[in-house]
Amino acid sequence: MINFDQISVIDDFLPKEQFEQISSLVMNTTENRFPFFIQKDVADDAEISGPWSWYATHTFFIEDEVHCVHFPLIKELFLNKFRNELNVMSGLIRARANFYPWTPDVRQHNWHTDYPYFRNNAALFSLNTCDGYTSFKDAGKIDSVANRMIFFNAHLEHCSSTTSNEYGRYNINFNF
């Protein structure tokens, strides 16, 4: 059982066929048609700025609205597992894919919390293995490893990073 009083890491979260289905879709390895939208700053990084401090997102679902034709796949692969197998989710707030670009050296973004104005939990699914990571202020770094899921209390201060050994760092973020 997942305990949100601590950070939980599950490797090989999806069966191989399901993982390949979602990773090839989001990482554009099949049709080159998955749209990402540029965000100027990561986590309101006003003090951390520069040509490297951007990322791109693709929202599947946010605040009771489906935003993507691929949401049924997200529901099938992840949300049903969250509800029925892991019993960690009653309602979804947001599901979003993130792309952090390559930089010559790994760069860390600003510390932040997700939806700080109400209690919620998060799950972060890595789509590729790279030298990027998610860092928790009080718990250290967790490497980006393909098919790895991290569950945590979204009020824990955390941050993302870029990658220096892949084209980009890809993940899917869930808040519930």
Model-identified regions with their sequence ranges:
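Double-stranded beta-helix
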Residues: 30, 135, 174-176
